[in-house]
Amino acid sequence: DSLNANLLIIMRVYFEKPRTTVGWKGLINDPDINESYDANKGLMLARKILRDVTAMGLPVGTEFLDPISPQYVADLISWGAIGARTAESQSHRELASGLSCPIGIKNGTTGALKPAIDGIQAANHPHVFFSNTKDGRVSIYKTSGNSDSHIILRGGKEPNFGSEAIQQTLTALVEADVN
């Protein structure tokens, strides 16, 4: 109770699995884990899970991996992440700029802060890009930027949760003039 004013607990619900090479890509892509790739079933199951969790009063957080699937689940997401492998991706930065929830951008897989800081700067600004509508048509999207983008320290070659690493991160964020 003493931390209620400072912390909001959310449930991490990740439906997509980032892969360095190959392997199962997650519930949305292959819900039966049998290479049938029934993405329609996966999306419907993902939405059901999100509805069930939010109906319990628990906000949900997820990593946005595929730039198309957020169109079908973002209305049920309270917080999102852009992963270390996609932090430098232009399409993910554009996506982050248009989402209606706070977006954390992870530092690079090596631990480098620059990909995340550059991602935050990009997400804070408006973008124009092609994507799909909910009915599957290609459309041009214009975003207004996401001022609630922030860094996620996920480690790298070494841990980065210590006070010295956090201070270096804060200094780098101030120098880059981002949240």
Give the role of each language-model region.
Residues 1, 178-179:
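Short acidic catalytic loops
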Residues 3-175:
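Active-site-facing alpha/beta catalytic cores
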